[in-house]
Regions:
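A short, flexible loop at the N-terminus of ABC-type nucleotide-binding domains that lies
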Residues: 1-6, 10-23, 73
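Conserved ABC transporter NBD signature motif
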Residues: 60-71, 75-76
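Conserved ABC ATPase "signature" region
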Residues: 101, 105, 113-130
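Catalytic Walker B motif of ABC-type/P-loop ATPase nucleotide-binding domains
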Residues: 159-163
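ABC transporter nucleotide-binding domain
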Residues: 177-265
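C-terminal coupling/interaction segments
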Residues: 269-307
């Protein structure tokens, strides 16, 4: 049984008649780290808010370990740690320690246990000396770390983290990565949103990609990239732009994408076509040509490009 099941969620905002989310379905299992990606305005935040009962769906249901959560906020509250929109799950006039005690109490922890759990997390991030400082006095990155600690305070079965590495330096982002991987190994299900695709590729086992309210891609990260990399991908830099005639000729053998001025990406449709491709490229004013391995950014661009 999946830890979290999202079944055909849909939402239209009446003020704009915009269908923000259209029949979204997915699952997060115990130990999964799932990255929920998409451009700004694609429907990620609306989906998260429906999962957390902050917005009511027009259709669809959410289940936690097989139990419907629509009318049971307590079930989610006890079992889910949440970081939404940066560090907004905190009281800004309080210290990190006071926030830990409050949020731990909301999830059934004693004051002593909440304090102990929070301080242990802050120690991992090297911020133990900031435990009594007000949140407003902390840097943006430190505030983000405290927000993450608040989400983790009661050792939840499920973590929902919105942009967990936003504003963090490389060292802190790596600590977040290590902690998420450790939690995953211990059976915690984790759903993250992020615009940092390198972080998503590093930490997530599964990718969900939403665009215009629809789920357009769902797959295992490593398996998907391994399949994609069986086809040759070339990055071509010229001294000028391709003419329309040249583009049409290359497109016979390749999926052609213009990356920037005079720079193109060529996905060779068949390995048998490589001789013809290189014959065509030999006639062009090539500045540089190199083979390239696909990464998550290529997948993201493919499924979200307009037109």
């Amino acid at each position: 049984m999946a830890l979290l099941t999202v079944d055909k969620l849909s939402k239209t905002y009446q003020a704009t008649s915009k269908k923000a989310v259209k029949d979204i379905s997915f699952a997060v299992d115990h130990g999964d780290i799932v990255a929920f990606l998409g451009p700004n305005g694609a429907g990620k935040t609306t989906t998260l808010k429906m999962i957390l009962n902050l917005v009511s769906p027009d259709h669809g249901k959410v289940y936690f370990e097989g139990k419907e959560t629509t009318n049971d906020n307590l079930l989610l509250l006890k079992n889910t740690g949440v970081l939404l929109e940066g560090s907004r799950n905190m009281f800004w006039s309080l210290s990190p320690l006071e926030n830990f005690i409050y949020w731990g109490g909301q999830r059934g922890l004693s004051k002593a246990k909440a304090e102990r759990s929070g301080l242990l997390l802050m120690k991992k991030f090297g911020l133990l000396d900031k435990k009594d400082t007000t949140i407003t006095s902390l840097s943006r990155g430190m505030q983000q770390i405290v927000g993450i600690c608040c989400a983790m305070i009661a050792q939840p079965k499920l973590l929902i983290l919105d942009e967990p590495t936003l504003g963090l330096d490389l060292k802190s982002a790596q600590i977040v990565t290590n902690i998420l991987q450790e939690l995953s190994a211990n059976g915690v299900g984790i759903l993250i949103t992020t615009h940092q695709l390198d972080f998503a590729q590093k930490v997530a086992q599964k990718i969900l990609l939403i665009n215009h309210g629809k789920l357009v891609f769902s797959d295992n990260v490593k398996e998907s990239l391994a399949r994609s990399n069986k086809q040759t991908l070339l990055e071509l830099t010229l001294t000028r732009s391709l003419t329309l005639e040249e583009q049409e000729e290359i497109s016979t053998y390749c999926n052609l994408t213009k990356k920037q001025m005079n720079c193109y990406q060529l996905e060779v449709k068949s390995q048998k076509a490589l001789p013809q491709v290189f014959n065509l490229l030999g006639k062009l004013p090539v500045r540089q040509i190199q083979t390239k391995e696909r990464n998550l950014e290529d997948v993201f661009e493919y499924y979200t490009e307009e037109g």
